[in-house]
């Protein structure tokens, strides 16, 4: 969408130089359908995750704190999906006013940063728990986890402020529709470039480097443990999980990040070709579906790595209430690896060496 603006009677009016870009009948049908599916699956799944972690597992571990906050961040975003579904179904006609435009846009931005930051902290926590289980005990406390989550929510809120400030409702004269969109003046390129780079670097590059580094070090520690304990059969599932986590994150977000940056270049007038604008505007909602659907599945994905979580989850589905007594913390395959470099380990110690347990 290439926009030129003017002000008449105090109303912001926009001319769209590529009025047909991204406006395809299949988009107006497919995307609202996908949004609806994401909404139903996401609300159901993340609500159950919150109930299981808070009421059944009693929120006793660092990992459970991060997963709970991840699910809550997803729920905040999911509540705005019906607005975006209606918006797309109405062929990008925004009927909800300027305030909801800002709130819904900020929610999308907030979820991006909060979820990515939480996944990054979760990867660091897994690294500390697995590679340095004894040294990290004093640092991996519930207080530290809760304070970290508060900081993450504040950072995500600050990163979402541009959506509150600069996302507005505009009337496009040559298509006669009202849109909820960012609009940048072509002569002021600093702001959009800064926001675009912030989204790319802070919302993807830095977190991905940290996640990749954390799980690579975990991978090396596990391989070293298997070499030391030669008589213990290798559990390749753990390595598949590590690979899946890294690839899952990368391929979920790369398409959206690429097209988001291209959209900024189009807004600035760096890209003038309407055919390119059409490709970008068509691809953007599809990449959003990929990124945020996978994002909303993350709490379930990480949770189901644990036996206790699966047991409590199935217990909840069967309407079995949580027991009054407290339970041990979240048990996952992605948690604490403890091993001794000794060939005289007991069988129980050998078993725990490769079983990831959140402490």
UniProtKB/Swiss-Prot annotation:
Recorded topology in the membrane: Multi-pass membrane protein
Entry keywords, A to Z: Cell membrane, Disulfide bond, G-protein coupled receptor, Glycoprotein, Lipoprotein, Membrane, Palmitate, Phosphoprotein, Receptor, Transducer, Transmembrane, Transmembrane helix
Localization in the cell: Cell membrane
Modification after translation (UniProt): C-terminal Ser or Thr residues may be phosphorylated.
Molecular function per GO: angiotensin type I receptor activity; angiotensin type II receptor activity
Lipidation sites (S-palmitoyl cysteine): 355
Residue positions with a glycan: 4, 176, 188
Major location (coarse): membrane
GO cellular component: plasma membrane
Disulfide bond entries: 18-274, 101-180
Top-level taxon in the UniProt lineage: Eukaryota
Pfam family, one: 7tm_1
Function: Receptor for angiotensin II, a vasoconstricting peptide, which acts as a key regulator of blood pressure and sodium retention by the kidney. The activated receptor in turn couples to G-alpha proteins G(q) (GNAQ, GNA11, GNA14 or GNA15) and thus activates phospholipase C and increases the cytosolic Ca(2+) concentrations, which in turn triggers cellular responses such as stimulation of protein kinase C.
Oligomeric and partner information: Interacts with MAS1. Interacts with ARRB1. Interacts with FLNA (via filamin repeat 21); increases PKA-mediated phosphorylation of FLNA.
Name listed for the protein in its UniProt record: Type-1 angiotensin II receptor B
Record organism: Mus musculus
């Amino acid at each position: 969408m290439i926009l030129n603006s003017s002000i008449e009677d105090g109303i912001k009016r926009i001319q769209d130089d590529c009025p047909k870009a991204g406006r395809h009948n299949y988009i107006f049908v497919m995307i609202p359908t996908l949004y609806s599916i994401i909404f139903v699956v996401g609300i159901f799944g993340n609500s159950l995750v919150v109930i299981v972690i808070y009421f059944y597992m009693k929120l006793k571990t660092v990992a459970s704190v991060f997963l709970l906050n991840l699910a809550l961040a997803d729920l905040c975003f999911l509540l705005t999906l019906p607005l975006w579904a209606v918006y797309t179904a109405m062929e990008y006609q925004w009927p909800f006013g300027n305030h909801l435009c800002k709130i819904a846009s900020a929610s999308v931005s907030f979820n991006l940063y909060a979820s990515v930051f939480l996944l990054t902290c979760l990867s660091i926590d897994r690294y500390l728990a697995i590679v340095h289980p004894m040294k990290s005990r004093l640092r991996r406390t519930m207080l530290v986890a809760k304070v970290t989550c508060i900081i993450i929510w504040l950072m995500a809120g600050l990163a979402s402020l541009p959506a509150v400030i600069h996302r507005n409702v505009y009337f496009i004269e040559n298509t006669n529709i009202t849109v909820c969109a960012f609009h940048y003046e072509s002569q002021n390129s600093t702001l959009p470039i800064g926001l675009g780079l912030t989204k790319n670097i802070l919302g993807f590059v830095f977190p991905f480097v940290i996640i990749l580094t954390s799980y690579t070090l975990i991978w090396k520690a596990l391989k070293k443990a298997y070499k030391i304990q030669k008589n213990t059969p290798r559990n390749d599932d753990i390595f598949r999980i590590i690979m899946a986590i890294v690839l899952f994150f990368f391929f979920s977000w790369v398409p959206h990040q690429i097209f988001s940056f291209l959209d900024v270049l189009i807004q600035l007038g760096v890209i003038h070709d309407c055919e390119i604008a059409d490709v970008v505007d068509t691809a953007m909602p599809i990449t959003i579906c990929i990124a945020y659907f996978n994002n909303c599945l993350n709490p379930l994905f990480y949770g189901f790595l644990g036996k206790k979580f699966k047991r409590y989850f199935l217990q909840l589905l069967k309407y079995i209430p949580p027991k009054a007594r407290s339970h041990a913390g979240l048990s996952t395959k992605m948690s604490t690896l403890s091993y001794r470099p000794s060939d005289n380990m007991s069988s129980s110690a050998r078993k725990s060496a490769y079983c990831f347990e959140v402490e």
